[in-house]
Amino acid sequence: MDLYEYQARDLFEKHGVPVLRGIVAETPEQASEAAAKLGTPVVAVKAQVKVGGRGKAGGVKIAKSAAEAAERAEAILGMDIKGHTVHKVMVAEGADIAEEYYFSILLDRGERRYLAMCSREGGMDIETLAKERPEALAKVPVDPIDGVDDAKAREILSEAGFPDSEQDAIVPAVLKLWETYRDEDATLVEVNPMIKTGDGRILAIDGKMTVDNNASFRQPDHAGLVDRATTDPLELRAGELGLNYVKLDGNVGVIGNGAGLVMSTLDCVAYAGENFPGSPAPANFLDIGGGASAEIMANGLDLIMSDEQVRSVFVNVFGGITACDQVALGIKGALEKLGDKAVKPLVVRLDGNAVAEGRKILEEFNYPLVTMVSTMDEAASKAAELASKEA
């Protein structure tokens, strides 16, 4: 889960990373009050969106009074930045910037380890720096067990070209950023820029964080980081049900077991949809996972059926750990529960473990909206056809 800047700032502060004061505002009036409360000659009014490039888009503005902060907030709130609407701003105190650095720790999935990146040239787009001047960006592997101690922090800074005389001031911030990364089960902690002020202080003034949703069982506080106001209601409900669900823009609901199979199913539906009026496309990604019970299947189908955008549903299950009879029981249970509310046609393709039992359950159930299809391509085509008729 990507966090907003203000959320990252709060977690940094929690772990002792030196940060500037910042107050979140949702209206120009609140921004004015925040600027007055901070009481600094200059404040930055910063759009809170989970995407880069907000500065170039006009999403970061300087204000020199409370009234000016309100004007800046009014201009920023409601902006569209790369498809993200700005609903909040953070009013942050200004800083006397002498130097700007870059620092991050991330999960390097390819190498199966952590990676620390550091540069003396912060404040600019890091992708551009890495492409145009790769020698200016140090990349140092971090062992997940050993982590970052004083010696490792100095190694990272040395690789980035910081002389020994400058490292003493920066090492404490690096250690606290590592602590944040480790203790919050993050997959990314990034500060750009980390600054040195005119009086020699080191501050993290713009941070990004991504936390691992798979660690939510030991990070109960992370539930409070979910922005319910901007998250799709179906995704919120799916999370409460423990379902791996992503909302898409099409009208064919998709349910499968295993991320690979579901992604292949999305492709099949999109390809098949090109042959029908309106070009039906996938409405969602929903992986019920391995060993799914009838209850999980029923919850998934109930969720998809509640999506007003969905015109047909394609259930594609290859039984391994997941038994096809449990899937069939889940379909039956969901349709019985929905009763007259179940008005969307289902195309079901079952294969593998307990397929005969699963097909028998659905055949005996004999529900008029359920169509059994034997192959994936035929099922995708049928689901797209039904969606085009229902549109």
Curated annotation (Swiss-Prot):
<feature type="binding site">
    <location>
        <begin position="320"/>
        <end position="322"/>
    </location>
    <ligand>
        <name>substrate</name>
    </ligand>
</feature>
<dbReference type="InterPro" id="IPR016102">
    <property type="entry name" value="Succinyl-CoA_synth-like"/>
</dbReference>
<comment type="similarity">
    <text>Belongs to the succinate/malate CoA ligase beta subunit family.</text>
</comment>
<feature type="binding site">
    <location>
        <position position="95"/>
    </location>
    <ligand>
        <name>ATP</name>
    </ligand>
</feature>
<dbReference type="InterPro" id="IPR005811">
    <property type="entry name" value="SUCC_ACL_C"/>
</dbReference>
<keyword id="KW-0547">Nucleotide-binding</keyword>
<keyword id="KW-0436">Ligase</keyword>
<feature type="binding site">
    <location>
        <position position="257"/>
    </location>
    <ligand>
        <name>substrate</name>
    </ligand>
</feature>
<dbReference type="GO" id="GO:0042709">
    <property type="term" value="C:succinate-CoA ligase complex"/>
</dbReference>
<dbReference type="GO" id="GO:0000287">
    <property type="term" value="F:magnesium ion binding"/>
</dbReference>
<protein>
    <recommendedName>
        <fullName>Succinate--CoA ligase [ADP-forming] subunit beta</fullName>
        <ecNumber>6.2.1.5</ecNumber>
    </recommendedName>
</protein>
<keyword id="KW-0479">Metal-binding</keyword>
<feature type="binding site">
    <location>
        <begin position="53"/>
        <end position="55"/>
    </location>
    <ligand>
        <name>ATP</name>
    </ligand>
</feature>
<keyword id="KW-0067">ATP-binding</keyword>
<dbReference type="InterPro" id="IPR011761">
    <property type="entry name" value="ATP-grasp"/>
</dbReference>
<comment type="function">
    <text>Succinyl-CoA synthetase functions in the citric acid cycle (TCA), coupling the hydrolysis of succinyl-CoA to the synthesis of either ATP or GTP and thus represents the only step of substrate-level phosphorylation in the TCA. The beta subunit provides nucleotide specificity of the enzyme and binds the substrate succinate, while the binding sites for coenzyme A and phosphate are found in the alpha subunit.</text>
</comment>
<dbReference type="GO" id="GO:0004775">
    <property type="term" value="F:succinate-CoA ligase (ADP-forming) activity"/>
</dbReference>
<dbReference type="Pfam" id="PF00549">
    <property type="entry name" value="Ligase_CoA"/>
</dbReference>
<keyword id="KW-0816">Tricarboxylic acid cycle</keyword>
<dbReference type="GO" id="GO:0005829">
    <property type="term" value="C:cytosol"/>
</dbReference>
<feature type="binding site">
    <location>
        <position position="192"/>
    </location>
    <ligand>
        <name>Mg(2+)</name>
    </ligand>
</feature>
<feature type="domain" description="ATP-grasp">
    <location>
        <begin position="9"/>
        <end position="237"/>
    </location>
</feature>
<dbReference type="GO" id="GO:0005524">
    <property type="term" value="F:ATP binding"/>
</dbReference>
<feature type="binding site">
    <location>
        <position position="100"/>
    </location>
    <ligand>
        <name>ATP</name>
    </ligand>
</feature>
<dbReference type="InterPro" id="IPR017866">
    <property type="entry name" value="Succ-CoA_synthase_bsu_CS"/>
</dbReference>
<dbReference type="GO" id="GO:0004776">
    <property type="term" value="F:succinate-CoA ligase (GDP-forming) activity"/>
</dbReference>
<dbReference type="GO" id="GO:0006104">
    <property type="term" value="P:succinyl-CoA metabolic process"/>
</dbReference>
<comment type="subunit">
    <text>Heterotetramer of two alpha and two beta subunits.</text>
</comment>
<feature type="binding site">
    <location>
        <position position="46"/>
    </location>
    <ligand>
        <name>ATP</name>
    </ligand>
</feature>
<feature type="binding site">
    <location>
        <position position="206"/>
    </location>
    <ligand>
        <name>Mg(2+)</name>
    </ligand>
</feature>
<dbReference type="GO" id="GO:0006099">
    <property type="term" value="P:tricarboxylic acid cycle"/>
</dbReference>
<dbReference type="InterPro" id="IPR013815">
    <property type="entry name" value="ATP_grasp_subdomain_1"/>
</dbReference>
<comment type="pathway">
    <text>Carbohydrate metabolism; tricarboxylic acid cycle; succinate from succinyl-CoA (ligase route): step 1/1.</text>
</comment>
<dbReference type="InterPro" id="IPR005809">
    <property type="entry name" value="Succ_CoA_ligase-like_bsu"/>
</dbReference>
<dbReference type="InterPro" id="IPR013650">
    <property type="entry name" value="ATP-grasp_succ-CoA_synth-type"/>
</dbReference>
<dbReference type="Pfam" id="PF08442">
    <property type="entry name" value="ATP-grasp_2"/>
</dbReference>
<keyword id="KW-0460">Magnesium</keyword>
